[in-house]
């Protein structure tokens, strides 16, 4: 559906869940894909195979911590050299450590901020020069419905996701003159490992809040990301595209 | 490196970054007024010069580098 022929994409947190589905969706469009992952080797190998089978001309795994700025700079350099340029960046890597605010530990707050928000910043800064030089590029940040709504038990996670919206809009303004577009996708409740942990009763209750009356799939989100990353979205920048079944409008 | 060398290299960088012909770049040329640079171009120029000459150009100094001459002066006085 979307044409990424001749393009290279870097997807963070690509070994599982939404990130994996995004990597596959971009590969289906003909993109070469760099898959970042934090440490789950088995899942990463599986994701790589799916991406290759989906039709990526070239695909490669890159294990690094997005919270480490030096590692991000190095990774971007490596991807450009290995896969021929870098045209699409998808900041998807994220962690959630749910706790009521009075019980949030400093290290959990800091780690969520580092991975979810600083990680996206690190890579955005690193890709800016190659994309500006190429006079074009697309960055898609994965935020969340809770970044706009808030959620009890997710003060830190929601704060990082709200922060990503500010990052998205600011960088969209900075880089627009170079035809680098920056957008965000805000998923609602999606069936992934992250939400599988929820008790059944909680899931049923959630579904009542969703007009489309089901949890989303990783593919639902991946399709929205692929659109924003593609040339079909050439006049879209600074946008937050909600993919939530209507639970927040 | 002589001042003439620095000047030539600075001109190369400017030509590359801004996509202008080297013959259009005079020592007195202002990046913004004469060479059509915008704020992003200036940041890119500063970063390219930092890399080429292995000098650090702090933001508050970069603000004062407005012409080719300013850049050459800064580099020749700060280069190790």
UniProtKB/Swiss-Prot annotation, chain B:
<comment type="similarity">
    <text>Belongs to the acyl carrier protein (ACP) family.</text>
</comment>
<keyword id="KW-0597">Phosphoprotein</keyword>
<comment type="pathway">
    <text>Lipid metabolism; fatty acid biosynthesis.</text>
</comment>
<dbReference type="InterPro" id="IPR009081">
    <property type="entry name" value="PP-bd_ACP"/>
</dbReference>
<feature type="domain" description="Carrier">
    <location>
        <begin position="4"/>
        <end position="79"/>
    </location>
</feature>
<protein>
    <recommendedName>
        <fullName>Acyl carrier protein</fullName>
    </recommendedName>
</protein>
<dbReference type="GO" id="GO:0009245">
    <property type="term" value="P:lipid A biosynthetic process"/>
</dbReference>
<dbReference type="GO" id="GO:0000036">
    <property type="term" value="F:acyl carrier activity"/>
</dbReference>
<dbReference type="InterPro" id="IPR036736">
    <property type="entry name" value="ACP-like_sf"/>
</dbReference>
<feature type="modified residue" description="O-(pantetheine 4'-phosphoryl)serine">
    <location>
        <position position="39"/>
    </location>
</feature>
<dbReference type="InterPro" id="IPR006162">
    <property type="entry name" value="Ppantetheine_attach_site"/>
</dbReference>
<dbReference type="InterPro" id="IPR003231">
    <property type="entry name" value="ACP"/>
</dbReference>
<dbReference type="GO" id="GO:0016020">
    <property type="term" value="C:membrane"/>
</dbReference>
<keyword id="KW-0275">Fatty acid biosynthesis</keyword>
<keyword id="KW-0276">Fatty acid metabolism</keyword>
<dbReference type="GO" id="GO:0005829">
    <property type="term" value="C:cytosol"/>
</dbReference>
<dbReference type="Pfam" id="PF00550">
    <property type="entry name" value="PP-binding"/>
</dbReference>
<dbReference type="GO" id="GO:0000035">
    <property type="term" value="F:acyl binding"/>
</dbReference>
<keyword id="KW-0963">Cytoplasm</keyword>
<keyword id="KW-0444">Lipid biosynthesis</keyword>
<comment type="function">
    <text>Carrier of the growing fatty acid chain in fatty acid biosynthesis.</text>
</comment>
<keyword id="KW-0443">Lipid metabolism</keyword>
<keyword id="KW-0596">Phosphopantetheine</keyword>
């Amino acid at each position: 559906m979307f044409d990424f022929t001749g393009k290279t994409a870097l997807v963070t947190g690509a070994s599982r869940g939404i990130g994996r589905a995004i990597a596959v969706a971009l590969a289906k469009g003909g993109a070469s894909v760099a898959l970042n992952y934090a440490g789950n080797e088995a899942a990463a190998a599986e994701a790589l195979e799916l991406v290759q089978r989906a039709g990526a001309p070239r695909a490669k795994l890159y294990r690094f911590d997005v919270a480490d700025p030096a590692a991000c700079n190095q990774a971007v350099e490596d991807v450009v050299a290995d896969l021929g340029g870098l045209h699409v960046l998808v900041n998807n890597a994220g962690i959630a450590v749910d706790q009521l605010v009075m019980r949030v530990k400093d290290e959990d707050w800091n780690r969520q901020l580092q991975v979810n928000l600083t990680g996206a910043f690190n890579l955005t800064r690193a890709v800016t020069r190659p994309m500006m030089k190429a006079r074009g590029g697309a960055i898609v940040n994965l935020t969340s419905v809770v970044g706009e709504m808030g959620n009890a038990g997710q003060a830190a996670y929601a704060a990082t996701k709200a922060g990503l919206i500010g990052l998205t809009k600011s960088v969209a303004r900075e880089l627009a003159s170079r035809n680098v577009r920056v957008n965000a996708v805000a998923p609602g409740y999606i069936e992934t490992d992250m939400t599988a942990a929820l008790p059944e009763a909680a899931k049923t209750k959630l579904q009542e809040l969703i007009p489309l009356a089901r949890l989303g799939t990783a593919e639902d989100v991946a399709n929205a990301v692929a659109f924003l990353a593609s040339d079909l979205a050439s006049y879209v920048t600074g946008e937050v595209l909600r993919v939530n079944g209507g639970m927040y409008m | 490196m002589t001042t003439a060398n620095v000047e030539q290299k600075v001109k190369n960088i400017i030509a590359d970054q801004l996509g202008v012909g080297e013959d259009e770049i005079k020592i007195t040329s202002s990046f913004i007024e004469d060479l059509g640079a915008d704020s992003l171009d200036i940041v890119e120029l500063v970063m390219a010069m930092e890399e080429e000459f292995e000098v650090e150009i702090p933001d508050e100094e970069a603000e004062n580098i407005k012409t080719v001459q300013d850049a050459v002066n800064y580099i020749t006085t700060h280069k190790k």
